[in-house]
């Protein structure tokens, strides 16, 4: 579907409350974006993911988030570790199943402030449990991103691993092709490429940019990686920063996992790895692609040492309805 900028969140089924609203608290003010747009919205249960490593800023924003939500449904905090969210996902699943006995509850899911790894694993868990078939997905875009000194809020690289539940084929007879989504985290992307040393690397950039000047920021963030790969900006594959279907269709075109496509890489020749360092809507598109081919694709994820406690964060500029799972391929 074409992403739609919205002023107010509507329930999945018009005139009826949702079963669940799921979102994540954060140090980023944009985690308030959906909560600020709930004028006539209501739901039975609100599940707020709350990461560890609490700071004063996180506590202040979380308090404001709860105040915005308390009149819209029963609020339940779900604690999780930012570095390893699987236990938090299990708790989220428990709360959903404890409050809904059938498949495919009506869910509004704000993907804005989950980590990329967490988002992929949460989506996979819900999908495997037949809980994702009636979900509307929202994304809040901030007014700006922190990119001081071509850095981001993710500091250092703690480890590089294949994300649990996303470990695909890895045959010794094949070369490795790394499809790496780039955005404002050039150092993490470079470290990932240096560690994996793939036979083929295909960088993908978010384009067209949502805001003027962001293309230049992405170029500056990833200048060293692109020069190492001997690639110019014009050489790069591009996908929409807001439309998950654009990302899914690009991945289908790049690979040969779907018959009839004019493919760049043949699956029979490569072990495919995807590095999801782009936008959250692109991450949703990656998931939509991976779910079509279970056990074929690996997700490579560079975990940072920590996330900086930044002196400033940026409020929501726009909130988008970016997808509806009722339209997904089954």
Tell me the role of every PLM-derived stretch:
Residues 1-106, 114-330:
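Long, low-complexity, Lys/Arg-enriched
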């Amino acid at each position: 579907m074409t992403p739609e900028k919205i002023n107010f969140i509507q329930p999945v089924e018009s005139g009826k409350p949702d079963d669940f609203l799921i979102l994540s608290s954060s140090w980023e003010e944009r985690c308030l974006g959906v909560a600020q747009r709930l004028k006539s919205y209501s739901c039975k249960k609100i599940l707020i993911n709350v990461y560890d490593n609490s700071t004063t800023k996180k506590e202040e924003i979380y308090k404001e988030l709860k105040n915005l939500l308390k009149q819209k449904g029963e609020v339940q905090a779900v604690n999780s570790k930012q570095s390893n969210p699987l236990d938090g996902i299990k708790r989220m699943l428990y709360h959903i199943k404890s409050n809904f006995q059938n498949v495919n509850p009506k869910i509004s899911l704000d993907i804005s402030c989950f980590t990329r790894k967490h988002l992929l694993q949460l989506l996979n868990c819900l999908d495997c449990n037949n809980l994702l078939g009636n979900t509307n997905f929202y994304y809040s875009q901030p007014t700006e991103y922190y990119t001081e000194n071509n850095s981001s809020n993710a500091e250092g690289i703690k480890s590089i691993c294949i994300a649990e539940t996303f470990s695909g084929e890895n045959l010794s007879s094949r070369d490795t092709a790394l499809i790496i989504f780039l955005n404002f985290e050039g150092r993490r992307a470079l470290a990932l490429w240096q560690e994996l040393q793939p036979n083929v690397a295909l960088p993908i950039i978010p384009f067209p940019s949502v805001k003027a000047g962001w293309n230049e920021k992405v170029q500056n963030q990833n200048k060293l990686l692109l020069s190492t790969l001997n690639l110019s900006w014009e050489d790069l594959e591009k996908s929409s920063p807001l439309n998950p279907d654009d990302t899914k269709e690009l991945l289908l075109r790049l690979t040969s996992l779907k018959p009839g496509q004019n493919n760049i890489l043949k699956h029979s020749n490569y072990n495919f790895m995807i590095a999801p360092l782009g936008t959250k809507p692109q991450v949703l598109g990656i998931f939509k692609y991976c779910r079509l081919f279970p056990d074929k694709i690996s997700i490579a994820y560079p975990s940072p040492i920590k996330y900086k406690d930044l002196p400033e964060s940026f409020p929501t500029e726009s909130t988008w309805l970016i997808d509806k799972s009722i339209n997904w391929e089954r």
